[in-house]
C-alpha cells in the first residue's frame, strides 16, 4: 500500500477531550475519529487492526471446535421477557419500537437469541456439547461514555455460548475457553490476569474476568503474591484480623457528639480508630428497604449485597423514609431484625467487641456497645463489605495487593438460567428429558485494541505487536527526482512480493514528518532509504518496540529480505 493513495490523517496535537493514552493516540495516529459521545468512526488503519484481532479470535475459537454464527442485532422484547431481563437489564439496554408498536432491543448480548434459535435444533445428548459464537456489533447506553473506545456505546464483541448435558461437560468447555482466551490475548500482545468476578445480571454460578493491569482501569483487582489468588474486589470475600479486646474492659455509656454524624467526624472527635465504630447504611430497592451495619472503616460492596438479596439495583433511603422506621438520620443505632426493614450485619463485625455506635438520638453515641448483648435475635453475619489492599487472602491469609485493571474478556458458567427460561431439554442416554446447562464467553474487540495501546506506547506513539499491526513493515523513502523514486518503488515491490505487509510512505513531505508518523502509528519494522543510500548505499532498519535502528550497506535484496524476515520472526516469537 502506498501512502500517497491512502488516508493518513495524523495529528501533532492531542485531542482536547482525550484523557487516556489510547484515546489520544488512536486519534493522532489516524486510526479513528469521534462521531459523538461514545461513538467512533474507524479509518482504514484502525479497521485493519480490528480485522486482525477478529481473525486471531476466530482462529483460536475454531481450534476449540466452536461454530461461527451471525444473529440479528435487533432482538424482540419477547426473548428478554422470557428470560426476565427486559426489566433487569435496566437503562443500559437500548430499546426501540417499530411502526407496528412492537418493542425490540439493540442487543448488548445474545443469550436469549441463541437459546431461542437452538432450542428446536437440539434433540439428543448426541448433539452435545455445542459451542457457538459470533463477532458482532453490540450496544450499551452508557451513562458516561469515557476513555475513548474503552467504554463506548457501540462496540464489537465476540460472544460465545456453550450448551451441555451436565456440569462436568460445561467445566470441560469452560477450561478449554479459558485456555483459548489466554492464547488469544497472548497473540494480541496483552498480558492478562484471570480473576474471579461477579456474574451480575448474566447470572450463573461462576465467572472470571480477563484483566489487564493499568492505572486507568475502572476495576480494582486484589492479588495474592503468596498463593496466586486473584479476584475482582467486587467478588473478593472479606477476611480481617480479629481485634483482641475484651468487652468487659470498656464501660458502656452514652456520650455527647454534637453535630458529628459521619464515621470520620465521630472518630476524630472521640480520638478512636474508625475500625472500633459501626456504620449504618440505609438503602431501598423496588421490593424492600434495607439496613446494613458494617465496621466503620469499611465500605459497603453493592455487588455482594445485590447478589445476596437477589435484587437488580438499590438507592439510598430519604431522611423521611428513615424516620418512618423509627430511626434518626445520621444517628442510627444497631437494631434487631424486624418486618419493616431487611436488617443485615456484615461479618467484619465481632459479636463480642465493644464498639462505638450511634444512639438513635440526635448528637449522641454509645461506647462499649456489644452486639451479642444488646441486639436480640442477632442474625447470621453476611459478607457484604468491600475487600481492600492489605486485607487477608481468603485462601492463605497472606496480605492482598490491589491493582487497577481493564476488563478485556469475561467467561461465565451460566447454569440453567436461560435453558430453564426457554425450556431447552434433550433426551439423555436413558431416554430421560434433561434441561441443559450453559456457558457464556465474551471478548471486547475494540477494547482489546485500545488496551494494547495502553500497554504499548511511549513518548513517540504506539508500538504495535506485529500480529495486529496495520502493516508489518513500513518503507520510508526520501527521494529527489523520478530516478530515485523509481529505485524506491523497486524496493517496495521486492518487499511486497515476499508476502510481507508493506506500507510505503511515498508522500511528497519532509523526512522528519515521515519518520515521526511511522513512530506515531507504530509500524513494527521500518526500512529507510534516503540520501545516504543514494550516496553510499546505506540502509537502516528500525525496530519500533526496541526503539533501536541499525544501519548497514545494501548488499542486495536477498540480504535485505533476510534481515527484515529475521526481525519479523523475532517479533512474532515474543508473542508465543
UniProtKB/Swiss-Prot annotation:
Domain of life: Bacteria
Gene Ontology BP term (one): prolyl-tRNA aminoacylation
Segments forming a coiled coil: none
PROSITE patterns from the UniProt entry: AA_TRNA_LIGASE_II (PS50862)
Reaction catalysed by this enzyme: tRNA(Pro) + L-proline + ATP = L-prolyl-tRNA(Pro) + AMP + diphosphate
NCBIfam families: PRK09194.1, proS_fam_II
Function noted in UniProt: Catalyzes the attachment of proline to tRNA(Pro) in a two-step reaction: proline is first activated by ATP to form Pro-AMP and then transferred to the acceptor end of tRNA(Pro). As ProRS can inadvertently accommodate and process non-cognate amino acids such as alanine and cysteine, to avoid such errors it has two additional distinct editing activities against alanine. One activity is designated as 'pretransfer' editing and involves the tRNA(Pro)-independent hydrolysis of activated Ala-AMP.
Quaternary structure, from the entry: Homodimer.
Domains (record comment): Consists of three domains: the N-terminal catalytic domain, the editing domain and the C-terminal anticodon-binding domain.
Protein name: Proline--tRNA ligase
Species name: Leptospira borgpetersenii serovar Hardjo-bovis (strain JB197)
